[in-house]
Amino acid sequence: MIEFLHEHGGQLMSKTLEHFYISIVALLLAIIVAVPIGILLSKTKRTANIILTVAGVLQTIPTLAVLAIMIPIFGVGKTPAIVALFIYVLLPILNNTVLGVQNIDSNIKEAGKSMGMTQFQLMKDVELPLALPLILGGIRLSSVYVISW
């Protein structure tokens, strides 16, 4: 074991760093896409149910099958891996964002409206901070997914 590490230690470290790079890029892209879409979807329950169902179906596809589909489109390399991981980590963030914003007490929203807040101010100053624990829970779950796949 020590001999193997001595011979291939540099390559092991570079591949580990490459894995972290791919994982972080996929996770950041998923956060950038899923949180705003989740906020928009939280306003319409019917559309949210349709989109979350489609995202859930996409997540049931095995990773190797997604990679097999991505390689002819994007070629071999980091790009198909990032796209495949992005698809897999999108759902927990999207789902938790929608649930976090939808489950805010209507009395709290009403209090913000009665103070004269615009829809944007209400989202920025009231809804988003209250939904943040659930959103961060989705990001945490997705970070575990992205590292393990």
Segments the model singles out, each with a brief description of its role:
Residues L12, T16, F20, V54-V57, ...:
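Hydrophobic alpha-helical elements at and bordering transmembrane segments
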Residues I87, F120-W149:
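Transmembrane alpha-helices
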Residues M1-A26:
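Periplasmic/extracellular loop-to-transmembrane helix junction in inner-membrane transport proteins
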Residues I24, I32-V33, I61, A65, ...:
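Residue positions within transmembrane alpha-helices of multi-pass solute transporters
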Residues I37-I69, L85, N95-L99, E110:
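Cytoplasmic-entry segments and transmembrane alpha-helices of multi-pass inner-membrane transporters
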Residues K15-I22, I71-P92:
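Loop-to-helix entry region at the N-terminal start of transmembrane alpha-helices
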Residues I24, L28-P36, L40, F86:
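Generic alpha-helical transmembrane segments of integral inner-membrane proteins
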